[in-house]
Design a protein with these regions (language model features):
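Phosphate/dinucleotide-binding and metal-coordinating scaffold of catalytic cores
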Residues: 1-489
Length: 489
């Protein structure tokens, strides 16, 4: 009888402890997951740099000779040493270099401008140095965008849907105290980004780029000399998009309403104005014509071909984190199972990919997997599961070309937008995932565009950058051209 009483007490104590443990697990689940590396970690730079309520101030302190040498040798993309002041805090011995792809080449060949985009790598010369926890800050020059808002808008939409994407803010750039220009500041997709989004036990990161052709393998007879870079210089400001064949009918479902263009009076119209005051789409001319060439070799298009690791060299060449063959095998295994439609939840971060697809398709960005060039995205793998992280949207909203005018851009197909890859096909063949994708598209239309999200973004940005653009000494456009483009957006 006495033993029975003790057992009853013991059971009661155990149950009480169990209840407390359950409560703690729920109350502190985020902290527990963060410690285990299963979820993101809050970073100081989220507010110190990317609080979009105010523009950040970036003063690059650099020897004039080094600055000029860096600009003159921009295509080498070599790091130089500088100090950087941000909001009154000085970071010493920071690495800086020009960045870009076609934009860098165009600016390098244009004697009238040195307005390059830049990378600031805080730990390049000083191990462990960061900017409020950020390892690398990207400063984009808003090339080929008279509105100065396209890329910021797309990143704002990614944040609105809660997709994994870089934080953004506008930055007033000075060089040795002299105003250089207003840029878009972005969180680089590297270690800090992974820590913020995925926690301490991050996976493997790649940036495949079919433009990095190396010795030409996987690209047949293609030669970079066949590309007409002469037409990649910033075009005129009449908004006349370059024409190309686009005969595929729109696959827009009846349940998703396309946003309509608003004129200056606030009225909506079915057709967007072409008098946008912005540079039209970039005209990329390739030998043999658009229809006969696709830059998608070495696995950059994420299509499964076979089990040979060498078939995916473009992915491995784009490694951001250190990787080995066992990591590569997990990627190929995932691509194979995705192509066969096997256990997609094991091999794809489905919800984030659907959010990525919705914003990316909404952006009509042909300089990407949805165009003819398999680049401008990051591939993230963790535990055999694949995810995509967006990148480079200055040519969004039809700026790349390849459409038959503004009407085609507005009515761009949404079911088969990623024509250059089969990676998303199995998702679209599943009714549940397809429906969720439509839901995210509709959310962008009804909540972000029509529900005030875009208006809030637009009013905030205009109030922040109008005067900075007006006095920008390196701007690609006149202030009047900016006003025309911004008013049309």
């Amino acid at each position: 009888m006495i033993a029975h009483k003790h057992i009853t007490k013991i059971i009661a104590v155990v149950m009480a402890v169990a209840v407390c443990l359950c409560f703690c697990a729920v109350a502190f689940s985020r902290q527990i997951k963060a410690a285990a590396g299963d979820t993101g970690i809050s970073m100081e730079y989220e507010t110190a740099l990317f609080d979009t309520d105010s523009v950040i101030s970036v003063n690059i302190l650099m020897d004039d000779a080094d600055w000029n040498a860096m600009l003159e040798n921009s295509t080498a993309e070599e790091y130089y040493q500088c100090d950087v002041e941000i909001h009154g805090t000085t970071f010493y011995r920071v690495g800086i270099r020009p960045k870009g792809n076609t934009s860098l080449t165009s600016i390098a060949s244009d004697p009238t401008t040195d307005r390059y985009s830049f990378k600031l790598e805080f730990d390049h010369y000083v191990d462990g140095q960061s900017c409020f926890g950020l390892d690398k800050l990207i400063l984009n020059n808003n090339y080929a965008d008279a509105t100065n808002m396209k890329e910021a808008l797309i990143y704002d939409m990614y944040q609105y849907l809660g997709a994994d994407a870089s934080l953004y803010n506008y930055a007033k750039i000075s060089v040795n105290g002299e105003y250089w220009g207003v840029y878009l500041a972005l969180e680089a997709v590297e270690d800090s980004f992974m820590l913020r989004n995925y926690g301490a036990q991050s996976g493997k990161l790649y940036k495949p780029d079919s433009m990095n052709i190396g010795d030409g393998k996987d690209f047949g007879d293609f030669n970079a000399d066949d590309m007409d870079f002469g037409n990649m210089t910033p075009p005129d400001t009449q908004g006349n998009a370059n024409q190309a064949n686009s005969s595929a009918p729109s696959q827009t479902p009846d349940t998703v309403d396309r946003p309509q263009n608003r004129d200056s009076s606030g009225e909506t119209s079915a057709e967007p104005s072409t008098d946008s005051g912005e540079r039209p789409s970039m005209d990329f001319n390739f030998a043999g014509g658009r229809g006969g060439f696709s830059m998608s070799g070495g696995g950059a298009d994420l299509n499964y071909t076979d089990d040979e690791l060498d078939s995916y060299e473009t992915i491995w060449d784009g490694e951001v984190t250190s990787t080995k063959k066992s990591d590569h095998k997990r990627v190929v295994t995932a691509l194979k199972n995705i192509s066969e439609g096997n256990d997609l939840e094991t091999y794809m971060d489905i919800d984030n990919l659907l959010r990525y697809m919705a914003v990316h398709v909404f952006s009509v960005n042909e300089d990407s997997l949805s165009g003819m060039m398999a680049h401008n995205y990051y591939l993230y793998e963790s535990g055999g599961k694949l995810n995509l992280i967006p990148w480079d949207y200055n040519l969004a909203l039809g700026g790349m070309g390849g459409s038959s005018g503004a009407t085609s851009v507005v009515n761009d197909a949404i079911d088969n937008a990623f024509s250059g890859t089969n990676f998303f096909d199995t998702l679209m063949e599943d009714e549940t995932y397809h429906s969720q994708y439509y839901t995210y598209l509709q959310q962008l239309v009804s909540e972000y565009i029509d529900g005030g999200g875009f208006d809030a973004f637009y009013e905030r940005v205009r109030s922040q950058i109008d005067e900075l653009v007006k006095t920008d000494p390196t701007a690609f456009y006149s202030y009047d051209e900016y006003l025309t483009a911004a008013d049309t957006l």
